[in-house]
C-alpha cells in the first residue's frame, strides 16, 4: 500500500518523460483508489495501466472486491495476478490464483 495523489503524479511524470525512448511495453499497476488518476494522466501516452488485484468472482456479495468486468468496463488493460505479496500475506492459493487468472482472461485483461 504505497502512493498518494502527489507522489503518483511525480512518478507518472518521470515515467512519461522517458516514454519516447521505450523499446518495450510498460504498464503501471496502481491501487484501486488511484486508477482514475493513472488512467487520465497516462491517456495519449504509450504507457498502459492496470490494477493490482482482481476478484475471482464475477459478481455477488463480496464487499471490497473488484471484478474483472468492472476493471475492463473502466478501461483497465492489465491486472496483477499471483503476486508474491498477495500469496504470502493473504494466503492466495494456486487455485485462487488460477481462478483470478481465468476471470481476468475472460474479461479481456
Residue positions per predicted region:
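Conserved N-terminal beta1-alpha1 strand-loop-helix module at the mouth
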Residues: 1-66
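Glycine/small-residue-rich loop that forms an oxyanion/phosphate-binding "nest" at active or ligand-binding sites
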Residues: 43-106
Amino acid at each position: 500500500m504505497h502512493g498518494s495523489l502527489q507522489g503518483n503524479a511525480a512518478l507518472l511524470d518521470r515515467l512519461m518523460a522517458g516514454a519516447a525512448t521505450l523499446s518495450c511495453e510498460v504498464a503501471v499497476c496502481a491501487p484501486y483508489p488511484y486508477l482514475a488518476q493513472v488512467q487520465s494522466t497516462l491517456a495519449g501516452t504509450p504507457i498502459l495501466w492496470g490494477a493490482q488485484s482482481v476478484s475471482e468472482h464475477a459478481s455477488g456479495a463480496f464487499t471490497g472486491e473488484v471484478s474483472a468486468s468492472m476493471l475492463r468496463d473502466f478501461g483497465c488493460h492489465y491486472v496483477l495476478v499471483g503476486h508474491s505479496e498477495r500469496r504470502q500475506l493473504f494466503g492466495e492459493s494456486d487455485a485462487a490464483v488460477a481462478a483470478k487468472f481465468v476471470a481476468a482472461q475472460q474479461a479481456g485483461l
